[in-house]
Amino acid sequence: MVPSNGAKVLRLLSRRCLSSSLIQDLANQKLRGVCIGSYRRLNTSVGNHANVIGDYASKSGHDRKWINFGGFNTNFGSTRSFHGTGSSFMSAKDYYSVLGVSKNAQEGEIKKAYYGLAKKLHPDMNKDDPEAETKFQEVSKAYEILKDKEKRDLYDQVGHEAFEQNASGGFPNDQGFGGGGGGGFNPFDIFGSFNGDIFNMYRQDIGGQDVKVLLDLSFMEAVQGCSKTVTFQTEMACNTCGGQGVPPGTKREKCKACNGSGMTSLRRGMLSIQTTCQKCGGAGQTFSSICKSCRGARVVRGQKSVKVTIDPGVDNSDTLKVARVGGADPEGDQPGDLYVTLKVREDPVFRREGSDIHVDAVLSVTQAILGGTIQVPTLTGDVVVKVRPGTQPGHKVVLRNKGIRARKSTKFGDQYVHFNVSIPANITQRQRELLEEFSKAEQGEYEQRTATGSSQ
């Protein structure tokens, strides 16, 4: 007996499932992989028994998802396709329009738009609106796709209609079964989709929103280091309800949408997907009232102040990261991070070039000619610098290790002193007479050298 195309595929799937060490390894972590049955069981199944491929539990214990391998029957052959024709909540809209953001929106914008709409459209807040729950589900579905980078990239590539059609069949990337020869279907792509989806659950960003601020520093504050208090607006846990979203003492009620299980089921072709209940967030319970201060969002917009330590040697446009002091997470996970970008003002005396600094020193005519000593400013105070006789404009001297200490290092840069010569615009009569005598003497020496050279 020659097995059908469907049987061949099922054989590959069962072997892949039973021999895969990856799923077994994941059992020791947060993911259980249970593959039940064999080729014989799969090939002869006539019921709707579902074999669990994997399950997932989030940090909070509320967000769970099971992907179930649906029932196969003996008539499953070469003409069956993974594509489906199921309806979609948003058949006439794209996900970006649902959330009211542009296609170039950043992750933070998408998250902000979602929380705003979720708060506005939550069924508990719109008990008189029969369409509120549907709208809430639309917003949640759009956010579920756009918050995940890989799903969003796929969505942008194939477009809304193609994505919805394929998603209704359970496999965003499948090509379906072709007539007779299989049409390019690769059964391993199915397991790739399963594994990818499962791992993506772990890779999804958790925590509150990151905050970015600018901080103005003087030149010396950047060079020597300092402490600054940064104040900014961000999401903060609601004080009224303690971040719970409901008034203290509010009684819990069993969620009617999921009957207290915390999960709802979606049937997509051969797949039965159980996902977190959108109404109760997987808790299995709801509340009769919500907090009036945060309107159930658990967080409110407020002002926050954080003390930031600036290391010595920072430079203009440097960005410092202060972990977990950003926006509060409505789900109760870790706060976001604070990113402080520095704007360092220019100094009237010092010019910076990496760890080195440059200063100008102005010499009088006589100092340049005769030499001597001058005082030069440094980062730690004035020092005396020797001027060689005959110093020309533009000459420089180097003061070793008088520059800036490099960040997180014990090494210092150098200081460069650039000499300029100041020519007086006004002089006294005596100074003129002396300069004229100097000029005559200089001219005489020149003529004498010329005459001596000619006689030779």
Swiss-Prot record:
Disruption phenotype: Defect in fusion of polar nuclei and in synergid cell death. Coiled coil: none annotated. CXXCXGXG motif repeats lie at residues 238-245, 255-262, 277-284, 291-298. Residues 94-159 form the J domain. GO terms for molecular function: ATP binding; heat shock protein binding; unfolded protein binding; zinc ion binding. Belongs to the DnaJ family. Chaperone that may play a role in mitochondrial protein folding. Involved in female gametophyte development. Required for cell death of the synergid cells during fertilization process, and fusion of the polar nuclei during megagametogenesis. This is Chaperone protein dnaJ GFA2, mitochondrial. It comes from Arabidopsis thaliana. The lineage of its organism: Eukaryota, Viridiplantae, Streptophyta, Embryophyta, Tracheophyta.
